[in-house]
Amino acid sequence: MKRTFQPSNLVRARRHGFRARMATKGGRLVLNARRAKGRKKLSA
C-alpha cells in the first residue's frame, strides 16, 4: 500500500508557504492570526 505522505519541499512550499498564504484573503487571515498569537514561524 502506498503511504499518504510523500514528502516534497517544493509542493510543501507551494501549498503552505508564505506566498501561498498571501495570495488569498483567507491565507492573510491565517498569517494575521499567527502573528497575533506570536508564532515564531508563520508558514512552511
UniProtKB/Swiss-Prot annotation:
PROSITE patterns: RIBOSOMAL_L34. The keyword Ribosomal protein applies. Signal peptide: none annotated. Gene3D superfamilies: 1.10.287.3980. It holds the Pfam family Ribosomal_L34. GO terms for biological process: translation. GO terms for cellular component: ribonucleoprotein complex; ribosome. Coiled coil: none annotated. Keywords: Ribonucleoprotein, Ribosomal protein. InterPro entries: Ribosomal_bL34 (IPR000271), Ribosomal_bL34_CS (IPR020939). GO terms for molecular function: structural constituent of ribosome. Belongs to the bacterial ribosomal protein bL34 family. HAMAP family: Ribosomal_bL34 (MF_00391). This is Large ribosomal subunit protein bL34. It comes from Cereibacter sphaeroides (strain ATCC 17023 / DSM 158 / JCM 6121 / CCUG 31486 / LMG 2827 / NBRC 12203 / NCIMB 8253 / ATH 2.4.1.) (Rhodobacter sphaeroides). The lineage of its organism: Bacteria, Pseudomonadati, Pseudomonadota, Alphaproteobacteria, Rhodobacterales.
